[in-house]
Amino acid sequence: HFFPAFYALYLSLFDTNLFGRWNWVGLGNYAQLLQDQDFLRSLANTGKYVLGTVPVGIALALGIAGLLNQPIRGLASYRTAFFLPYVTPVVAISIVWTWIYKEDSAGMLNAVLSWFGISPQAWLLDPKWAMFALCLMSIWRHLGYNVVIFLAGLQNIPAEYYEAAEIDGAS
């Protein structure tokens, strides 16, 4: 299982071409990579995406799982509603979110914002909003799966622990 990763690392230490000529460059490829502005911008965007989706997605999923762990009416319907985006094909989700983020007032999000006097935004075209829009879509897409995982964990906590916590005054 580790061979492909180590072989790729080994290959990265060479400069190659299509004719099989291999020149040892050591860490030169990595030095060149760290000077490439496109790579650095991509690295920064990846960091923003991860920081914008992982903590928010986990906190939101844990909160919803906590709410769904309570004895409420129609619990199966709520679970289905939250899990449905995860099993929906990515193409369908992309089409729906493109419609939501449409640039003019025909977009659902811009239509709602116009009710509050906020001018339409180009959500996917404006660099200051595009990352936010993609993070929001990604959080929504994976929320159901994360809720199911957290809910399974919460439901496996023995009732005695809840009783002990209540006796100890935990809220």
Give the positions of each predicted feature:
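A structural signal for multi-pass alpha-helical bundles of membrane permease subunits
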Residues: H1-S171
